[in-house]
Amino acid sequence: MTSVGDGWWRWDGPSTASESDGTPTASDLVLDYAFVLDGAEPPVPDPRSAWQPHGVHAPSRTFDPATLTWTDSDWRGPRAGQGVLGGIVYELHIGTFTARGTFAAAIERLDHLVDLGVDVVNVMPIAAFDGRWGWGYDGVGLYAVHDPYGGPAAFARFVDACHARGLGVCLDVVHNHLGASGNYLARFGPYFTTAHSTPWGPAVNLDQDHADHVRGFIIDNALRWLRDFHVDALRLDAVHELRDASPRHLLADLSDAVAALAEDLGRPLDLIAESDLNDVDMITPTAQGGRGMSAQWDDDIHHALHVTLTGESHGYYTDFAGGAGRDEAGPLAVLAKVLTCGFLHDGSHSSFRGRPWGQPVDTEHVDARRLLGYLQTHDQVGNRMTGDRISAVVPPGLQAAGAALYLLAPTTPMIFMGEEWGASTPWQYFTSFTDEALADAVRAGRRAEFASHGWSTADVHDPQNPATREASVLAWGEVDEAGHRRLLDWYRACIALRRRVIGVGPTRLADVRVDVDEAARTVVTLHAPAGRTASAVVLNLADDPADVPLLRSGGRVALAWDPEGTTLTTDAVRLPGGSAAVVLW
């Protein structure tokens, strides 16, 4: 290798070619290699390797994206070039979406997503990590595709298959830390700093000496997925842990770089942040001084829905139950605020954090599609002690009610895999680390975390037990069972109705009104944008039938969980207990 200055070294590949005309053969273009740094053994893999066929501790293998075969030359982006905002997002994990847990197997299930009405597939992290199975958030080869899933070529085929079916692809990427096993990045330079700390240890170095190279490493990684693998959007994990005191935040630089690439490619590219800051600066354009994210996950929507449906009020759910010194009398009042304001914590006190939290959303001018709403996510299911889904906690009618609220809201909806049919399989935390000391530490950490919430640790599953991952694999045979099929039909109908009443343009929370009755356990939301069809989602969360007053008279019932028990009068809907209906005007 040749030093080219500033700590960089260069190698241009084989010095001789195998063909008589000087053209390298295929064997010349695929080479295994590793680095010996300052004489230290053993050699370590390339931090920018695209391919780790023998695992994250083994040599890297060269991979040329120009060798990929694509059939998506006519692809204009999700929703015929509209992008992710406002579309139906579907979060899935390659390793548990199917029993085989590969990209090839996932392709076989894509038609189900098309039939459901999905627009964008949100793929959980695929960066190379230690072991066969895992959630993916312990990635260490950030440029490499996890080989047990199929490797880089298989991922390209998956993206191509999605595009062939009209599905966009959003890839979950983790830039706020690296996993503990196979993390050799610090040997290559000052990629981490003790000037800041994170839950995983020293922070990624974004603002100390030599940070420009680290920032470039992250931005190049993002652009590579979008450019070389034709990905349409990136979900950025826990961006609040990107500790950056620079004059300009990394996310703003990343946003501008992605915008420039989108212009070059001629198709929309979106960045979706996972952020618990409740800070609208995250979704404010960089030209206005913001960080330029297209959208952000909105956990407040999840928390409000979950507490409303389940009655749980421990931990970070406490404030979402209302009462006890809050302005909101109960969980339904909290739900009303979140559905009309975007956040519960918009500068108000957070008892979980012990201080005021968040900023208000300008409901007149901020595009509501920039907030993602959901009833379940991998985190909100998998970080429960038994990984139990909402379908294991509440009856189908209540899940249907919650689904109607977020699927027909002006925010961007996201479904977690299997949610649409009320999957009976849990989603549990699983690992397959080869380092037994690390595995023991993970086990102890999970037990301590659940004990801190007051739960008995006797029921905590072993993340390293292969049965834990196997239990989390979707049981696709359930789709055709009557009870599951009913819920699936409901989700499909809500999505189809959304296309009629929400449309494809910008939306406003200011167009939403909500009326609740805490005692009667009823909710009515009215979305009435000027010049468009008005829609109301009407819920009876109580056990007994109830007459639920509407916020305007007339209309017609377009959808009901229990059609035979649902009747519309001039200004009310009579609903059976634990059910929902949608009224249009």
Q: What are the roles of these predicted feature ranges?
A:
Residues 569-585:
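C-terminal beta-strand-rich structural cap/linker in extracellular carbohydrate-active enzymes
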Residues 4-91, 98-101, 112, 437-438:
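The feature marks proteins involved in alpha-glucan
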Residues 37-77, 165, 183-199, 316-319, ...:
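Core domains of carbohydrate- and sulfate-ester-processing enzymes
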Residues 76-84, 93-264, 270, 282:
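Substrate-binding/active-site clefts of carbohydrate-active enzymes
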